């Protein structure tokens, strides 16, 4: 369908951003140009992530270093994705879901395998994700989007015979996430034991500062879940009251 739109000239009117990838070589770990890789990934992706698959590398033409690297294409891709979907009048929730998948599809999770030397294992262990890193990953992606992100990563690899990606990376990260999920996990503001009313009870005035402070508290709790008690959070928050 997308290719037919291109051949008839309609794609330029509907999603000209996709055409930017036509003929843009990826070298290194890709066989197709950006445009055809996006179409191929969309073809193999499950229905619920086809849009994310179609857009996941859409930022590459604007970040092309002309040496096979596209630094920041995930961030640029998120921006373009939001622009396209807003223009096409998608619901805000769907725009945010797809944009998050595009923004985070380049994750890298280090893991060890049998047969590795001790030196290799030591290097990987130095890069191991802490519980805090896992919580931040989930918070960034959205807990409800994690499985879709894994499906996107697998579709991306399936559409590219030259990929260096190994499915075990997803399997190992899934295990790590399960370990963290089994603990008391705080990944969003509503998981905190206090809310805006609690902040107002100690002197905060209703307004933007409440949201700002709650997000600052969340950042602290992502690093140290032991801080997620009413007493500790209110003590920290009390130091942020604007007199």
Residue ranges and their predicted role:
Residues 1-165:
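Conserved, hydrophobic alpha-helical core segments of structured domains
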Residues 83, 87, 157-243:
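Charged substrate- and nucleic-acid-binding regions of tRNA-handling and nucleotidyl-transfer enzymes
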